[in-house]
């Protein structure tokens, strides 16, 4: 007797279903991982979403919760497992797994603990999706992006750190808020390390083409009577403040990662400050990943914009690179 399925549907295609073309995997289903997953779903960037986590019940519960909302989404397939075979044929893999940053803990203190985790997960990602682009989100993101590049064997343009894309968004929001305009109308960049030694490019801040340094030559310096420099300090401290208030950060970084995913998936050639290999640029001699203005397309980092910086900004960027190298050179087993 024929089933309801066979009575209802007559198949026409003889071949098996095609593999996904725009599959995204999120590794780690903590607060950050799920914020990334949800924002990617809401922005309709994937035809399949895979979730992976070492805690099997947690990852399957998150999968079911999202599947139950499928009616309200445009992603037809959501899968999850602790086995990395579920990630096969991913175009983009977002890595959020790692030890959570604690209140008052500086990002660079997380290094070796998270390196040991990456030694397990990165080879598995590459085994199942050898052509993928990896976006590293786990902190300390610049160090772990370098570690991912070393462990993966992928070309450097396909290993990207979320970097200062979020720092720059925070900077633009805080500066625009003081000016009474929308953050999209303020143009400003933060480069270097995602965190304590990040570099605000005050020389490039502008609104509608009006460079703020021409209005206030001391902007961002210790001699600035308006104390705009405090805005960058607020950017650096903002994650610690949010962690102090709610225990973790997740929504802003999730939105930031979805923004990067869109530029990559849709071949947009948009420019983002993300963590990339900086050796040979701005006098940086060591193999470090830090944020520079990168053109993102379907191949990963297509190119890097040679931003005009002041001598002081270059020195700060070199200092940021030195800070990261001092950590990296002591890492074990990568």
From Swiss-Prot:
Q: Which UniProt keywords apply?
A: Cytoplasm, NAD, Oxidoreductase
Q: Which residues bind NAD(+)?
A: 30-58, 100, 139
Q: Which chemical reaction does it catalyze?
A: (S)-lactate + NAD(+) = pyruvate + NADH + H(+)
Q: Could you tell me which Gene3D superfamilies the record lists for this protein?
A: Lactate dehydrogenase/glycoside hydrolase, family 4, C-terminal, NAD(P)-binding Rossmann-like Domain
- Catalytic residues of the enzyme: 194
Q: In which pathway does it act?
A: Fermentation; pyruvate fermentation to lactate; (S)-lactate from pyruvate: step 1/1
Binding residues annotated for substrate, in chain numbering: 107, 139, 170, 249
> What class does this enzyme belong to in the EC scheme?
oxidoreductase
Domain of life of the source: Eukaryota
Q: Where in the cell is it found?
A: Cytoplasm
Q: Which GO terms describe its biological process?
A: lactate metabolic process
Any one GO molecular-function label of the UniProt entry? L-lactate dehydrogenase activity
Specify where it is mainly localized. cytoplasm
**Which body tissues produce this protein?**
Eye and liver.
Which PROSITE patterns did the record assign? L_LDH
Identify the InterPro entries for this entry: L-lactate/malate_DH, L-lactate_DH, L-lactate_DH_AS, Lactate/malate_DH_C, Lactate/malate_DH_N, Lactate_DH/Glyco_Ohase_4_C, NAD(P)-bd_dom_sf
Where is it found, in Gene Ontology cellular component terms?
cytoplasm
Q: EC number(s) of the enzyme?
A: 1.1.1.27
Question: Which PANTHER family does this one have?
Answer: L-2-HYDROXYCARBOXYLATE DEHYDROGENASE (NAD(P)(+)), L-LACTATE DEHYDROGENASE B CHAIN
Subunit composition and interactions: Homotetramer.
Which family does the UniProt entry place this protein in?
A: Belongs to the LDH/MDH superfamily. LDH family.
Q: What is this protein called?
A: L-lactate dehydrogenase C chain
Organism, as annotated: Fundulus heteroclitus (Killifish)
């Amino acid at each position: 007797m024929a089933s309801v399925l066979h009575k209802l549907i007559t198949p026409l295609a003889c071949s098996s279903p095609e593999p996904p073309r725009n599959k995204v995997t999120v590794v780690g289903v903590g607060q950050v991982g799920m914020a990334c997953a949800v924002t990617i779903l809401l922005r309709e960037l994937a035809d399949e979403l895979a979730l992976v986590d070492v805690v099997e019940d947690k990852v399957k519960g998150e999968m079911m919760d999202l599947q139950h909302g499928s009616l309200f989404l445009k992603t037809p397939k959501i899968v999850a497992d602790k086995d990395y075979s579920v990630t096969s044929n991913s175009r983009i893999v977002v890595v959020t797994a790692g030890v959570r940053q604690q209140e008052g803990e500086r990002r660079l203190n997380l290094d070796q603990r998270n390196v040991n985790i990456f030694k397990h997960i990165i080879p598995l990602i590459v085994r199942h999706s050898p052509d993928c682009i990896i976006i590293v989100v786990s902190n300390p993101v610049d160090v772990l992006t370098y570690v991912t590049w070393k462990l993966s064997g992928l070309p450097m343009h396909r290993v990207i750190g979320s970097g200062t894309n979020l720092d720059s968004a925070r900077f633009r929001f805080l500066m625009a808020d003081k000016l009474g305009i929308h953050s999209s109308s303020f143009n400003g960049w933060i480069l270097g390390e995602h965190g304590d030694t990040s570099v605000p490019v005050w020389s490039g801040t502008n609104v509608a083409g009006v460079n703020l340094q021409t209005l206030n030559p001391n902007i961002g310096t210790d001699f600035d009577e308006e104390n705009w420099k405090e805005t960058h300090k607020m950017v650096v401290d903002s994650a610690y403040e949010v962690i102090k208030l709610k225990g973790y950060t997740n929504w802003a970084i999730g939105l930031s990662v979805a923004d990067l995913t869109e530029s990559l998936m849709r071949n947009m050639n948009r420019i983002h400050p993300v963590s990339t290999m900086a050796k040979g640029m701005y006098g940086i001699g060591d193999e470090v990943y830090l944020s520079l203005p990168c053109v993102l397309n379907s191949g990963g980092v297509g190119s890097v914009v040679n931003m005009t910086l002041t001598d002081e900004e270059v020195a700060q960027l070199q200092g940021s690179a030195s800070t990261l190298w001092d950590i990296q050179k002591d890492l074990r087993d990568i």
